[in-house]
Amino acid sequence: MFQANLLKDKRILITGGGTGLGKAMGRRFLELGARLTICGRRAEVLAGTKAEFDADFGGRTTTHVCDIRDPAQVEAMVEGIWADQGGLDGLVNNAAGNFLAKSETLSSRALDAVLGIVLHGTAYVTLACGRRWVAGGESAAVLSIVASYTRSGSPYVMPSAMGKAGVLAMTRSLAVEWGPKGIRCNAIAPGPFPTEGAWQRLVPNAELEAAWRARIPLGRFGEQGELADLAAFLISPRAGFINGECVTIDGGEWLKGAAQFSFMDSLSEDDWAAMKPRKGR
């Protein structure tokens, strides 16, 4: 659907790029000619994704082990990227954390764990790149992955909803502040896109999966390639007049029932106990 080499030689960083939607976006960007950098906390995951990408696209993928919750690690990573490849043309803030829980059961540690990645980590990476773009007088594009419940809120994922709402506020604030400097900031608000691992934590049984699907006017979940195509367009020069926008891609779910995880009201206490996060998992 895109012209060949739409992203030719564009240097793009994807946080959380080793798995799931981040990996899907990375593959699409490489198909369109980008030079890709992915970061994450697990070296073995990044190495596996890099090996897969290198086999398909040659050596156009670089990895950085980085916990974006730590501003010192973020600064070191971004400084290394600028030193090694002269900077970036695009940033995709994709790294996230989420789990289902009744809000009254949340500890401060659980709240901080999600906000540290979703809100603070996203801001750390964006600002580390942004101050270099501004200092160098460079144009760039920032794309942040939020959620379809960013505007409405949602029960049982309150920390994620808080963090994503903050990221959307950051996106629109910087779109105005940095727009005159040639730096575009946009967001994508995905609905349900099954990914390995995360999907099982959020949708623990077939009955809940069926109930969720029934809420979506199009009657299905999203496909990772659909989101990757949207991301490729928004990060590309062809979206050069789009700034401060948040594009929802959820099959119309938010129009039918705004609070995404409200169908979890049907869970029993045993279901909640079974889903409680366990150390080491």
Language-model features, listed with the residues they occupy:
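Short C-terminal tail/terminal secondary-structure segment
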Residues: 2-3, 243-281
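Conserved glycine-rich cofactor-binding loop
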Residues: 16-20
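Active-site helix of classical SDR
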Residues: 126, 163, 171
